[in-house]
Every structure is written in structure tokens, then in C-alpha cells.
């Protein structure tokens, strides 16, 4: 920026006056904007060579100013491009104040375990799982590729939602059988989060990340089950034409009378549906700490996306991530 100001100051210096010249008086307000004192200097140039010289100086000055601005922007972006924060234990998170956590991304992370064993080492019995946290680390959507005639496959996406997609404070009964199998039932907690991702082609896919009413069973290294996926929009939500599932207009299509508003191609737009659907999740235990009752692992969930109250066909969304829980006997 200093270089651009110096170049601008150079252009403000007077040049020799020749015949057939055009006098350009410097503007006092422009000088003050650059922090320069106004001394009544004049910038003069001939219609031929002097004008070309002035234009060349202007181009050089703009290049210097542009380079200075680009460098400043690069420095600012580089300074703010910090990586994900270090994953903390439950006790470390609890010991931090609000200001220490604010803006760091820690509030969107599940805790980890310091120490422990790389196996499920809880005795058979009935436990109560609490503080269950599920943190997604990747979202993929089953869709066609950017190029034509490509088969359906799970495409990588770009997250459009802020760091508010982690499920937390989930609890429910957790049972360990004598044969080593486990069973978990979700009962309460922050068990849903609205998320929107963007496909490579630009299409945005909203969905409700959830494990509502989950009943998962199996071995600790792989126990799975189905869960309820509520409608992304509630039944009282109204579209731009005032149509809803439980309120609003029944039909809002500007067509002549004769039942055309109930035709099949328009029925899905007029007849809103807030019906729930099903998803499936598989959880795996990777590490436990029996003395504190802590368990961590990984999960993979496949669930449908938003249907716009029945107007669109849902897409399969695969969510992978890590989870944490505490077991109390």
C-alpha cells in the first residue's frame, strides 16, 4: 500500500508545459484522501507523448496497488486459515470457560479418551448411556456425477452449514449380554440437526441428521439398528404459494377448472406430506476406559434427505464420523 501511495505522489508532481498541451488540475480533495498536502501543483501532458507517459505511469501505479492489496488479502486469509482444534477429553472441555471455547470449534467436537484399552471391557449388565455425542466428519450424497451418463454413486460434498451439526447429550438404556453383545435404545437428548451440503454440480441437499428412536444391537465392534427420520419441514410449514400439510391452501395452481390441479404431475406439489422415513446406523467401539465409564468409536449412517414435503424424491445421504458416550451402572 505504501508503494501505491508513492506512485500516486509521483504522478502528482508537475511536468514541463509544451505547446498544444492539456492541463489537468489536481483535485484538492483527492490529495487529502491520499494524505498529501495541496500546493496547487498541476499535472500536464501533451496530447501525444506526455499522455502516453502518464497512462504508463497510471498502469504501473495500479499494478503496484493491486499487488499490495492482493498481498494483504493473502496474509489475512492465511492468518485465519487455522486447522481443526485439538480434540480434548471430557474433563478438559468441562474445565474451560465460555470465552475459551467460543469461536474455536471445540463445542462442535465430541470428547476423546486419554488412556484406556482398545477393546470393549465392560462386564455384562444393564447400564445407562449418557452424554452420547455423534460428530460427523464426512457427508456424501448418492447422486449422478457432474458428467452425463455416470452411474449413481456417493459424491463428496461441500458443507454449507455452520459448526452446529453435532448431536449431543443423548441418553438411553445400554445393555451388555453374557455373550458379549450389546443393545442401545435412544430415549432423549439433542438427537437431530438440520444440515445442508452442496454437490459438485452446485445442487444443495438439505437433510435432518438424526438418530431418533434408535434401537441398535450386535457385537461391540459392529452394532446397528434403524431410526426415525422426521420430515425436514413441519406439517404447518407453508410453501411460497401458501400450501401446507396441515394448514394453508389445498390447491394453489393457476389453471382452469376441471380438476387439472389434481393431476399426477401437480399432485405432489399440492398434496403436502410430512411423513417420516427410516435410516440405518452402524456403530463400532474402538476404545474404552472402564474406570470412568467412557466409550469412543466410529459410526456410519445412511438416511434419506429432505423431500420438500413430498414434492421431491429423497437422496441417500451417508454420514461418517466419531462418537463418545459414558456408561453408568
Swiss-Prot record:
GO terms for biological process: photosystem II assembly; photosystem II stabilization. Keywords: Chloroplast, Manganese, Membrane, Photosynthesis, Photosystem II, Plastid, Thylakoid, Transit peptide. Disulfide bonds: none annotated. The keyword Magnesium does not apply. Residues 1-81 form a transit peptide. Residues 258-281 are annotated as: Disordered. The keyword Chloroplast applies. Stabilizes the manganese cluster which is the primary site of water splitting. This is Oxygen-evolving enhancer protein 1, chloroplastic. It comes from Pisum sativum. The lineage of its organism: Eukaryota, Viridiplantae, Streptophyta, Embryophyta, Tracheophyta.
Amino acid at each position: 500500500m505504501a508503494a501505491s501511495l508513492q506512485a500516486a505522489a509521483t504522478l502528482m508532481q508537475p511536468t514541463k508545459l509544451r505547446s498544444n498541451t492539456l492541463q489537468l488540475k489536481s483535485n484538492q480533495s483527492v490529495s487529502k484522501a491520499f494524505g498529501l498536502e495541496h500546493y496547487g501543483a498541476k499535472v500536464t501532458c501533451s496530447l501525444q507523448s506526455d499522455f502516453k507517459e502518464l497512462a504508463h505511469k497510471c498502469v504501473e501505479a495500479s499494478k503496484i496497488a493491486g499487488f499490495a492489496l492482493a498481498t494483504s488479502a493473502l496474509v489475512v486469509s492465511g492468518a485465519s486459515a487455522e486447522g481443526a482444534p485439538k480434540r480434548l477429553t471430557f474433563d478438559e472441555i468441562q474445565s474451560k470457560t465460555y470465552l475459551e471455547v467460543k469461536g474455536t470449534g471445540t463445542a462442535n467436537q465430541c470428547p476423546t479418551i486419554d488412556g484406556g484399552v482398545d477393546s470393549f471391557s465392560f462386564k455384562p449388565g444393564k447400564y445407562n448411556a449418557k452424554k452420547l455425542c455423534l460428530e460427523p466428519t464426512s457427508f456424501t450424497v448418492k447422486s449422478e456425477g457432474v458428467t452425463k451418463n455416470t452411474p449413481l454413486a456417493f459424491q463428496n460434498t461441500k458443507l454449507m452449514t455452520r459448526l452446529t451439526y453435532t448431536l449431543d447429550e443423548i441418553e438411553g438404556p445400554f445393555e451388555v449380554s453374557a455373550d458379549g453383545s450389546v443393545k442401545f435404545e435412544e430415549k432423549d437428548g439433542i438427537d437431530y440437526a438440520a444440515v445442508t451440503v452442496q454437490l459438485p454440480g452446485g445442487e444443495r441437499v438439505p437433510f435432518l441428521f438424526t438418530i431418533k428412536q434408535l434401537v441398535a444391537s450386535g457385537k461391540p465392534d459392529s452394532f446397528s439398528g434403524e431410526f426415525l427420520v422426521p420430515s425436514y419441514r413441519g406439517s404447518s410449514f407453508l410453501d411460497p404459494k401458501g400450501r401446507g400439510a396441515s394448514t394453508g391452501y389445498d390447491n394453489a395452481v393457476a389453471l382452469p377448472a376441471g380438476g387439472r390441479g389434481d393431476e399426477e404431475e401437480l399432485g405432489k406439489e399440492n398434496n403436502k406430506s410430512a411423513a417420516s422415513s427410516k435410516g440405518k446406523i452402524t456403530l463400532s467401539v474402538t476404545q474404552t476406559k472402564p474406570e470412568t465409564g467412557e466409550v469412543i468409536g466410529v459410526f456410519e449412517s445412511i438416511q434419506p434427505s429432505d423431500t420438500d414435503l413430498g414434492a421431491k424424491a429423497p437422496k441417500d445421504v451417508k454420514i461418517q464420523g466419531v462418537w463418545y458416550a459414558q456408561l453408568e451402572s
